[in-house]
């Protein structure tokens, strides 16, 4: 497909070049083009005071994705390269993981597998309908959508990547039920999560027969796992499959490095740019060394063939 964009990042400093990414800026300008150009000028000037929005500006306004690797988990290309077909995972050992920091917006569940040198992540999210309506225009009709880019919650729902929950909160039992359902297909050995909401979730998971591991110091784990995660992205050893929601989560992560070089995974924007799926992935990576490239169903088939 033909994409109008800047040829290089440094072209953004000359507003005359913006026409490359926005053909409507070719003279004479329409009334709408004049209004949009003024808006983009204001956004560009704001970058002087707050450069943290530069990645979003370059992607949204100049159609040129750029990545500040001092602030992001991986480059745009590395994140996009997670879009590879999932191998056959049925019967394989998996680490269950979840992020359930808030009952009122998002929750993410996941299963981490090892396939040779690759980390394969299968995930599902739950989103509260009222939150999706307010911040992403979930219930709007297509004719009512504004030009501002929202996360396409309804599209992701239709693709089975998430479920929208119409209630006052996301019920903890909903999360537990997802893992119970997955247990029929995969060998879930443990479920790991940080300590947020685990006072509620842990008894429910244990009652369902799962072994639960709680990460009590998530920031220390971020720092511990950052080199492994960054290396896995760089070497294309992470597979999310056809899952734009998971890539959205990952792209929303802000990497904060302290004076000692320790890294913490935060959000680039607190409200709309969610990271729940990525945080669940980090929890899974905490126990990744326990994973084996092993198929339980194959082992059971061999046992059935033995004559005792």
Where are the regions that the model predicts?
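Flexible, glycine/threonine-enriched loop-and-boundary segments that flank and lead into catalytic domains
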Residues: 69-97, 181-187, 192-193, 200, ...
């Amino acid at each position: 497909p033909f994409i109008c964009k800047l040829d290089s990042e440094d072209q953004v400093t000359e507003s005359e070049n913006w026409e490359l990414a926005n053909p409507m800026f070719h003279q004479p300008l329409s009334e709408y083009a004049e209004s949009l150009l003024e808006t983009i000028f204001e956004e560009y000037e704001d970058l002087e005071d707050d450069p943290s929005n530069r990645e979003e500006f370059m992607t949204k306004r100049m159609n040129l994705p750029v990545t500040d690797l001092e602030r992001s988990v991986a480059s745009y290309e590395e994140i996009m390269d997670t879009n590879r077909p999932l191998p056959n995972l049925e019967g394989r050992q998996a680490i269950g993981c979840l992020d359930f920091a808030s009952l009122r917006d998002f929750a993410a569940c996941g299963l981490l597998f090892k396939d040779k040198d690759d980390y394969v992540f299968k995930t599902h999210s739950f989103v509260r309908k009222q939150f999706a309506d307010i911040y992403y225009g979930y219930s709007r009709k297509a004719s009512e959508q504004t030009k501002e880019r929202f996360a396409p919650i309804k599209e992701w729902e239709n693709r089975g990547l998430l479920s929208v929950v119409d209630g006052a909160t996301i019920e903890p039992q909903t999360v537990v039920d997802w893992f119970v359902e997955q247990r029929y297909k995969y060998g879930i050995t443990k479920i790991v999560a940080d300590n947020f909401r685990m006072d509620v979730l842990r008894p429910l998971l244990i009652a369902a027969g799962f072994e639960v591991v709680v990460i009590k110091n998530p920031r220390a784990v971020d720092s511990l796992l950052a080199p492994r995660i960054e290396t896995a992205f760089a070497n294309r050893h992470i597979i999310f499959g056809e899952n734009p929601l998971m890539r959205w989560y990952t792209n929303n992560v802000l990497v904060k490095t302290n004076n000692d070089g320790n890294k913490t995974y935060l959000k680039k924007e607190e409200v709309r740019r969610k990271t729940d799926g990525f945080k669940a992935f980090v929890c899974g990576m905490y126990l990744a060394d326990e994973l084996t490239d092993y198929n339980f169903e194959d082992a059971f088939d061999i046992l059935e063939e033995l004559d005792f």
